[in-house]
Design a protein with these regions (language model features):
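Acyl-donor-binding surface of acyltransferase catalytic domains
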Residues: 1, 63, 70-143, 274-278
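Short amphipathic alpha-helix that is part of the acyltransferase structural core
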Residues: 1-41, 138-169
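A conserved beta-strand-loop-helix scaffold within acyl/acetyltransferase catalytic domains
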Residues: 38, 44-45, 68-72, 164-217
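Cytosolic beta-strand hydrophobic patch enriched in CBS
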Residues: 54-58, 186-190, 245-246
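Conserved acetyl-CoA-binding loop-helix of GNAT-fold acetyltransferases
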Residues: 82-94, 213-216, 222-239, 259-264
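Conserved GNAT acetyl-CoA-binding A-motif
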Residues: 94-103, 237-251
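Conserved active-site alpha-helix within GNAT-family acetyltransferase domains
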Residues: 102-121, 227, 251-271
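C-terminal "cap" of GNAT-fold acetyltransferases
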Residues: 125-146, 243-259, 265-280
């Protein structure tokens, strides 16, 4: 314990619980992290890469910071009332690249005191927001397409083809066991031949929802399916008490399609991720 702070390393599921606890307590539209997407990022590959280090810090029994070293790139969250802890987090990390939200100005300044300066990539993620009042009513799907309950096999299949990755049914079952997963927020559309065509998953914490992920099979794109699935998930989130929703998409011009699709649903950019680098 240093300076009244207790660090816990590589705690497995306890780490995720600590991350979600802090993200929920600190959530605002100036926060990078929503508790729901943390659950998704933790479980989407069946758990974190064993080579990636994690830690969280407590002060008087309360989680006040967490850090996730993802192969030499740091993701973190730090209670603004405990910015003095920045030195310990940076020392634990020992690396050179940190990603933050550009609205986290106090954290950016604190990291700057330890040599980190903004140096953005050509690629970055934008954060978009929309209120959940005034959502359009559900429209009919294209001929032959239907809604289907989100069984794990179908959801893993659509995620795999939509994002060009391999996700197993067992991994998706793990996602469905996450405490914050709600099946009514998990929307699945199937094609006329019964194969999965598009999906959207929302997560709700308090009055804020986040969409993560949204995807469409390449052969079924440009039919409005991702938009329909997203709106269905947002309506379900509103029914659970959410008042606003956020989604992240590439904000650079190298991949504008997703951002444009969300803007067509009424989302507007309000912040972006920023990369901070400390010279070697």
């Amino acid at each position: 314990m240093t300076g009244g702070y207790q660090r816990v390393d590589d705690a497995g599921p306890e780490q995720l619980a600590a991350m979600r606890d802090l993200a929920g307590r600190l959530w605002s539209w100036s926060s990078r992290w929503h508790p729901g997407e943390l659950a998704w990022f933790w479980y989407e590959h069946g758990g974190p890469d064993p080579a990636w280090r994690t830690a969280y810090w407590r002060h008087r029994g309360e989680v006040v910071a967490w850090a996730w070293d993802r192969g030499g790139r740091l993701d973190l969250q730090l209670d603004p009332s405990h910015l003095a802890l920045t030195a310990q987090v940076v020392a634990w990390f020992g690396g050179h690249t940190v990603t933050v939200l550009d609205a986290e100005t106090e954290l950016i300044d604190a990291l700057g005191e330890h040599g980190y300066a903004r140096r953005d990539d050509d690629r970055f993620f934008a954060h978009l927001r929309r209120p959940l009042d005034g959502l359009p009513a559900a429209a009919p799907l294209p001929d032959g397409y239907t809604w289907r309950p989100p069984d794990a096999a179908a959801r893993a299949a659509i995620h795999s083809v939509a994002f060009g990755v391999t996700m197993s049914e067992a991994v998706y079952r793990g996602i469905q066991r996450a405490p914050s997963y709600r099946p009514e927020l998990d929307q699945l559309i199937v094609a006329p031949d019964g194969t999965p065509a598009a999906s959207a998953l929302a997560w709700v914490d308090g009055d804020a929802a986040v969409l993560e992920p949204v995807g469409t099979s390449p052969e079924h794109r440009r039919r409005g399916l991702a938009g329909a699935a997203s709106l269905a998930a947002l309506r379900a989130a509103r029914d659970l008490g959410a008042r606003d929703a956020r989604v992240c998409a590439r904000g650079d011009d190298g991949y504008p399609a997703a951002r444009a699709a969300y803007e067509a649903l009424g989302f507007r950019v309000y912040a972006r991720n920023a990369r901070l680098v400390r010279p070697a």
